[in-house]
Amino acid sequence: MSSIPANLPLRNDLIGEEPYGAPQLDVPVCLNVNENPYAPDPAVCDTIAKRVREIAPTLNRYPDREHIELRQAFSDYLARESGTRLDVDELWGANGSNEIMLQLFQAFGGPGRTALGADPTYSMYPEYARDTFTGWKLAHRNADFTLNVDKVLEAIAEVKPSMVLLTSPNNPTGTPLPMEDIERILAACETAEVVGAGEGVHPILVIDEAYVEFRKPGTPSAVSLIKDHPNLAVSRTMSKAFAFAGARVGYLAASKGIIDCVRIVRMPYHLSAVTQAAALAAFEHTDEQLSRVEHLRETREATAAWLKEQTYKDQPLEVAESGSNFLLFGGHFDKREAIFDELLKRGVLIRVVGPDGWLRVCKGTDEEMETFRNALVEVLRIVEAA
């Protein structure tokens, strides 16, 4: 990085690296980071302000480092959302699911250890591996982005990872992960070896469910498997469907053993009193916070159908199956950066991510999606002719 003086003792493996992050630009239509586009209702804002005001006189003291009340709120929410009641000591909170994932890598990764994923996958995972000196290996998905379970099982046997990390629905493709696939991989992890570990040590399976509330109704969550599988950890967030990205609250559901491992590496008092108060206030309004999820699902399906009717260089656009609030589309964009740039000129920010030839767009308000559609039709013709 040119801005870093050469005389600073930056780690050798970080020299030349750039900070991770999607473009953060002030444009009218932001459809690039998979947020819920609808702001919290005024009643939710009032409750957040009330909760924070109540704890303000205590800010000279450290917060509850075990955040017991918030963990109970996670339990109540999962019982409602996924039909599974977990104990408080089977839950853990952090500053976004990014911190949850980093804590998992800190606890179960490290020098001599390897984590296994399936590409294309979330681009932060190799960053967590790098930051914790953990090896990072990949098993390749099928051409339609569904998980190739046989390849994952082969990689588990060959790599002997300490963690297997899968996203459901997948990011950046949106692909759902069937429960039977999760159960097959869990079974393999329960007997697999971990390189460099002692006899009887087996890998954990981490399922990242950041977007799970957008799944098709009736689809179970991996949380329902935790009671029977102590080697399973499920990461969740309040940033997506719950419309709470600015508060930075993620949480982990897992056996008490896994939670206790994560507690070893957590920073003291890592969740501020303000964060805890705001999250508790949001959970008081779960119905309101999730009220737009069904509409966003409908928007996803309508947008997918519309995209399939569009063409680029006389070929219809491909759209990956999605159980999330975003769509990966294109498939044969030979100038995807040019399409991105032309959309940006028109005030629409999407994401260049995933395999070559594809772009990703998340679901915005009805007005934002209309702007996106109108801009894309114009842009595809311009880029074709260039």
Describe each region flagged by the PLM.
Residues D41, N231-Y312, E318-V319:
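PLP-dependent aminotransferase class I/II
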Residues D26, V88, A320-F326, G354-W358:
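Short Gly/Ser/Thr- and Asp/Glu-enriched loop/turn motifs at secondary-structure junctions
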Residues A107-Y128:
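Conserved PLP-anchoring active-site segment centered on the Schiff-base-forming lysine
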Residues E180, D341-R346, R351-A386:
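PLP-dependent enzyme catalytic core of the Aspartate aminotransferase-like
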Residues R297, E301, Q310-R346, K363:
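Conserved PLP-binding catalytic core of the aspartate aminotransferase-like
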Residues L147-V159, P172-A241:
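Active-site pre-lysine segment of PLP-dependent enzymes
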Residues W136-H140, M163-P169, I204-E209, A320-S322, ...:
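Short beta-strands and strand-loop turn motifs
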Residues S2-G96, Q103:
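N-terminal small-domain helix-loop-helix segment of the aminotransferase-like
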